[in-house]
């Protein structure tokens, strides 16, 4: 039988490492431990979303008599304040409790972390050395930026490289070619941050990478003279949870796995 790690020890470390209490988020978003268990964990499962498919996937991997893994996600269950545990929410929480699986969520705290954050890790995978931060959200800077490396010498090459590092099909990343053919200063805010194009422009960037954005951002990009690449909300947020799980696995000597449930969005 595996020797489990006390849940409270891992949670205390994560809360401090990710600055859970210090980083602001949406008004009713809950970051940190969302569902507790009986006290021991035997591994780590990372995922983007705490969906029913994700939870069912974790349950399918459980070994009888072994301590369960902790489920680490970017998009947790608790976003909208005090609401009844009914319907879909009840079914997901009940499945976690029935199988003693704890759930830990980190939204904005994971996006902005300088080591395992979605933005920082994507920059690293693209070969971009982070030189600064931009994009104000409730008093903190959301995005990272740096100069384009030689491997990203054209705006088209950025879209192709995003498909490669995010393991998406060629052509998945959408390029809005509003800026220069040869990028110089590239910014990144993963997820659904298309409305931050203005912040990227104000920071003097000529190319902006995000997951997705509303229709009008096409014209924003073309008329403001900035390249925008949308590489998928889900895809751009797969890297942070994996980096976080890898970091925890090494620190606490736990095996970890990533459960991939792409949405195509």
Describe each region flagged by the PLM.
Residues 1-265:
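Hydrophobic structural segments
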